[in-house]
Amino acid sequence: MKPSWLQCRKVTGAGGLGGSLPASSPARGAGPARRAYVAPGPRGALGGRGCRALSSGGGEYKTHFAASVTDPERFWGKAAEQISWYKPWTKTLENRHSPSTSWFVEGMLNICYNAIDRHIENGKGDKIAIIYDSPVTNTKATITYKEVLEQVSKLAGVLVKHGVKKGDTVVIYMPMIPQAMYAMLACARIGAIHSLIFGGFASKELSTRIDHAKPKLVITASFGIEPGRKVEYVPLVEEALRIGQHKPDKVLIYNRPHTDMVPLAPGYYLDWDEELSKAQSHDCVPVLSEHPLYILYTSGTTGLPKGVVRPTGGYAVMLNWSMSSIYGLKPGEVWWAASDLGWVVGHSYICYGPLLHGNTTVLYEGKPVGTPDAGAYFRVLAEHGVAALFTAPTAIRAIRQQDPGAALGKQYSLTRFKTLFVAGERCDVETLEWSKKVFRVPVLDHWWQTETGSPITASCIGLGNSKTPPPGQAGKSVPGYNVMILDDNMQKLKARCLGNIVVKLPLPPGAFSGLWKNQEAFKHLYFEKFPGYYDTMDAGYMDEEGYVYVMSRVDDVINVAGHRISAGALEESILSLGIVADCAVVGKEDSLKGHIPLALCVLKKDINTTEEHVLEEIVKHVRQTIGPVAAFRKAVFVKQLPKTRSGKIPRSTLSALVNGKPYKVSPTIEDPGIFEHIEAMLKQAS
């Protein structure tokens, strides 16, 4: 049904700082489309006062989840009232291009306006938007919403001056600096589609993505900093353009302060500071709800690059809703997602989510250890009054490995710290319990994917979910994500039976709308195996209470003599023994059983016994916790495991290595040399 509309009504729910769009502006840009429209919602719906409850919680998780499944149009229509729109949508949900779902059809908005301008118009311009903390350069800065707008609107003007228009693509190749966020927001401001590529990717990988995205312009910086080394970005960009097919019109370079200027060839290469000094501010350009905000390339693909496309309107609605409903934050509180802008967590929860919701976001250019030590996280939490932290379990393990008693953290008072969220990989129980003990706050695991852009399962503490869920789970289905566990024949499995984790369609707002220039792969990869469902390609189970336990990728399930054993369950069993700091389990080919599990283990520093004795203890413990069916009896001890920069273990690469097959090292691996060490240890053990 077509909703009735109220023109320019301010909404005061958990979007908090939200309101109408500007009536006029001296800047260039949006032209006559200046007015905001928001839906009042029918009497008695979850909108208005009820919408506030929807965003602020009150133990209503079950009600909200049921409403999101039975009447998604009504549920998300009310959540969308927290966002300011130039033009109302005519239909909340449409499945015209199945399996992709269109949300807020024909509605027009601008996500940069919602993230920055509207807060300033509501008197919050002097509030801190970004805290930049860079131990690698010994730099700290606080940046207000007003200051962000000044930089972003001028940068938008620079882009337009050099021919970038709505619908054009822009590649951003930058380190963890505020200018990377300004670039994202400036693209969004004018309706350009950004593709932010992890700073430090090799030229070949960068070239592949540039050729696929075909950007009008590339934005980069003079250099980035990785552990122990400075990475010069401009030569990497130059080489990528030399070996690639596509040539962008211009390359805009930000020269980082206190360093030598990068010499620029006049005409083609543009200097950031010089361009901004003469730039005119540019206003927000309205875009349709389905307009792509960004392309984010994911790893692990062959053939055409897998570029996840994120539609603007649904993403804005979901992120704003999630900051309060999932993460339990109030506008104005300090939030820190300890990730990289190049990953989906960085897009959603360093940049867009916290700013949409009116929070202060911490942008951290450092590591959990080594910048300068394992007390770094505690310092940032204390110094900036962080209310909630989002990090990967691998970061916690790194801290624990270097400082088992968290002695370096004891000097800091974490008075404002309320909740620690972990995601990115399965969090073993021992890491979870250690985190609770040293941070003294609830530690909540949750699960999501690049494709979804926000959590699929979580403890929605803003909706009254428990802050002490059972260990090992990754939360319950987030409203909008109707999660089910199916076998390969599409039969629903009983509680605690390992199977395929799928989501019944439609996917909620914020999920991807396709793969850039590859819709055939979009349909084939995610929707063909289980028609009517989104295939997460993860394996796990659900308990009787509805908690979801994500065990591993489907292809990480090891088939031992016909028994399906989760690599994640074996890893958790090994880690729970307390003598192994980190481990990865892969299937080793076996002539009798098909596959047998092999564990690559990193011992804790303080273990004073032989590897033979440790292996005996591990084998005994796995038999007790998993059972003899796992046929576990082999481990190889290594000094460290390879990890991607987002903290994931490249299991498929390790599996190939263990089985003596050719393998390719992903450009996202932190220390590629570790594979040679593991290869040597495997030869020594065989």
Curated annotation (Swiss-Prot):
Subcellular location: Mitochondrion matrix
PROSITE patterns reported in the protein's UniProt record: AMP_BINDING
Binding of ATP, residues: 424-426, 445-450, 538, 553, 564
Cross-referenced Pfam families: ACAS_N, AMP-binding, AMP-binding_C
Modified sites of kind N6-succinyllysine: 517
One GO cellular component term noted in the UniProt record for this chain: mitochondrial matrix
Main subcellular localisation: mitochondrion
Transit peptide as recorded in UniProt: 1-29
Keywords from the UniProt entry: Acetylation, ATP-binding, Ligase, Lipid metabolism, Mitochondrion, Nucleotide-binding, Transit peptide
Keyword ATP-binding: yes
Gene Ontology terms: biological process: lipid metabolic process
Top-level lineage group: Eukaryota
Catalytic activity: acetate + ATP + CoA = acetyl-CoA + AMP + diphosphate; propanoate + ATP + CoA = propanoyl-CoA + AMP + diphosphate; butanoate + ATP + CoA = butanoyl-CoA + AMP + diphosphate
Record PTM N6-acetyllysine, positions in chain: 523
Entry EC number(s): 6.2.1.1, 6.2.1.17
Binding site for CoA: 226-229, 623
Stated role: Catalyzes the synthesis of acetyl-CoA from short-chain fatty acids. Propionate is the preferred substrate but can also utilize acetate and butyrate with a much lower affinity.
Similarity section: Belongs to the ATP-dependent AMP-binding enzyme family.
Name listed for the protein in its UniProt record: Acyl-CoA synthetase short-chain family member 3, mitochondrial
Origin species: Bos taurus (Bovine)
Native organism taxonomy: Eukaryota, Metazoa, Chordata, Craniata, Vertebrata
